[in-house]
């Protein structure tokens, strides 16, 4: 058994060293190791606009969700029950205090418990990022490294793709109502891809979803959404 574990570690190390950084998820033919390119290769960054939560001039995070290349969901109960945990908050606080603080600011639960929210997102979605399986790290793996890497990537993507900045630079400001195409065009002109918008039944903006393919293991490349979402006509952008 010890020999087998050592062999598996060596294989994982070789994979980590030989992955091509040019492979784009959902765009390759043949076989590519799922440590090198995500099995669920169309990834959705869902951002929330929830009055009372997060900074008044920032969208906050709902989650980063791996989907199939056709846009279907990954398994609803996650992809690896052995890595399910209800302690994401304590893990982050003890492992990376800076990340923990960023998440409290930009990834708050609108139901009151950040740890439960983050743990749900990890268990359902984070465990489905195949390139973050512990075996993909080889001998360099440190316990919880994949959790830190997942949440770091999500927060970094939120910072990099500044939806509020895209809207404000195009004159789309909270407290006003605009046509849905005004939102779509403003975000596309700034970020380079068409987003998906979600509204509640009253026509109030609640979420903006950005779609990505992944180049190599973790280089996210924005792409157009598969559909425009649930917003129609006049959309109200509430103040926080």
Feature names for model-found ranges:
Residues 1-18:
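Fungal secretory targeting signals
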Residues 3-8, 40-45, 189, 208:
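Intrinsic-disorder/low-complexity peptide segments enriched for small residues
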Residues 19-105:
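Betabetaalpha-Me/HNH-type nuclease active-site subdomain
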Residues 5-8, 37, 114, 202:
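A generic structural signal for short, solvent-exposed coil/turn residues
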Residues 104-240:
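C-terminal, well-folded lobe of enzymatic/effector domains
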Residues 2, 9, 56, 222-224:
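Exposed boundary/loop context
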Residues 16, 23, 32-33, 119, ...:
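Disulfide-stabilized extracellular ectodomain repeats and their linkers
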């Amino acid at each position: 058994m010890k020999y087998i574990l050592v062999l598996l570690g060596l294989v994982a190390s070789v994979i980590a060293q030989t992955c091509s950084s040019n492979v784009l998820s959902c765009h390759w033919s043949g076989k590519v190791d799922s440590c090198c390119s995500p099995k669920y290769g169309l990834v959705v960054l869902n951002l929330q606009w929830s009055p009372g939560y997060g900074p008044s001039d920032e969208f906050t995070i709902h989650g980063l969700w791996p989907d199939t290349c056709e846009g279907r969901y990954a398994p609803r109960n996650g992809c690896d029950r052995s890595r399910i945990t209800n302690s994401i908050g304590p893990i982050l606080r003890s492992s990376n205090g800076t990340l923990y603080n960023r998440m409290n600011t930009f990834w708050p639960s609108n139901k009151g418990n950040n740890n439960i929210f983050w743990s749900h997102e990890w268990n359902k979605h984070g465990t489905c990022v195949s390139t973050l399986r512990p075996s993909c790290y080889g001998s360099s793996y440190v316990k919880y490294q994949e959790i830190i890497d997942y949440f770091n990537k999500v927060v970094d993507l939120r910072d990099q793709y500044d939806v509020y900045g895209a809207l404000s630079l195009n004159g789309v400001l909270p407290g006003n109502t605009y046509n849905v195409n005004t939102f779509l065009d403003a975000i596309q002109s700034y970020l380079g891809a068409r987003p998906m918008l979600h509204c509640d039944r009253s026509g109030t903006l609640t979420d903006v979803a950005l779609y990505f393919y992944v180049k190599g293991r973790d280089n996210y490349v924005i792409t157009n959404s598969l559909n425009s979402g649930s917003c129609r006509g006049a959309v109200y952008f509430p103040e926080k």
